[in-house]
Amino acid sequence: MRIIGIDPGLARVGYGIIDEIEGKKIMIDCGIIETKSTKKEEERLVEISNDLSSIIKKWNPNSAAVEKFFFYRSSTTISVVQARGVIMMTLGKYKLPIQEFPPMQIKLAVTGYGHSDKNEVLNCVMHELSITSPPKPDDAADALAIALTGIYLK
């Protein structure tokens, strides 16, 4: 099984690709899709879709896990929701089964505690994937946690 985990955003979309083979989880790739704030929002959304399509074509995941947006008041809320919509549409275009998880559920699945901090989540991700260096940037590490959640809760 190969899964792509996605941490949505407009400026940066984190992604992480994990294989699960006979119970062992192996990180294949992780990184970010970054868009420039100097571009028009619609151009940034197209860039996210195009770059995500390239990642899907390259790694051919069987499924996807996406962080579910929970509402909070912020000047970027609408932009993030729009980016998430583009991400969901792009995943749908490739007919990938999608699981959605709110942040607390991701923390609970990865660490066993729904109120874990970022460092606790990161340490558990590194341990589970047997990696010695923290994935950078944080968005990529978060995407790996989301992918692991998709594996754990399939």
Curated annotation (Swiss-Prot):
Keywords: Cytoplasm, DNA damage, DNA recombination, DNA repair, DNA-binding, Endonuclease, Hydrolase, Magnesium, Metal-binding, Nuclease. Its main location: cytoplasm. Mg(2+) 2 binds at residue 67. It comes from Prochlorococcus marinus (strain NATL1A). The active site is at residues 7, 67, 139. One of its GO terms (molecular function) is DNA binding. PANTHER family: CROSSOVER JUNCTION ENDODEOXYRIBONUCLEASE RUVC. Homodimer which binds Holliday junction (HJ) DNA. The HJ becomes 2-fold symmetrical on binding to RuvC with unstacked arms; it has a different conformation from HJ DNA in complex with RuvA. In the full resolvosome a probable DNA-RuvA(4)-RuvB(12)-RuvC(2) complex forms which resolves the HJ. The RuvA-RuvB-RuvC complex processes Holliday junction (HJ) DNA during genetic recombination and DNA repair. Endonuclease that resolves HJ intermediates. Cleaves cruciform DNA by making single-stranded nicks across the HJ at symmetrical positions within the homologous arms, yielding a 5'-phosphate and a 3'-hydroxyl group; requires a central core of homology in the junction. The consensus cleavage sequence is 5'-(A/T)TT(C/G)-3'. Cleavage occurs on the 3'-side of the TT dinucleotide at the point of strand exchange. Its cofactor is Mg(2+). Binds 2 Mg(2+) ion per subunit. GO terms for biological process: DNA recombination; DNA repair. This is Crossover junction endodeoxyribonuclease RuvC. InterPro entries: RNaseH-like_sf, RNaseH_sf, X-over_junc_endoDNase_RuvC. It is found in: Cytoplasm. Belongs to the RuvC family. It catalyses: Endonucleolytic cleavage at a junction such as a reciprocal single-stranded crossover between two homologous DNA duplexes (Holliday junction). Its EC number is 3.1.21.10. It holds the Pfam family RuvC. One of its GO terms (cellular component) is cytoplasm.
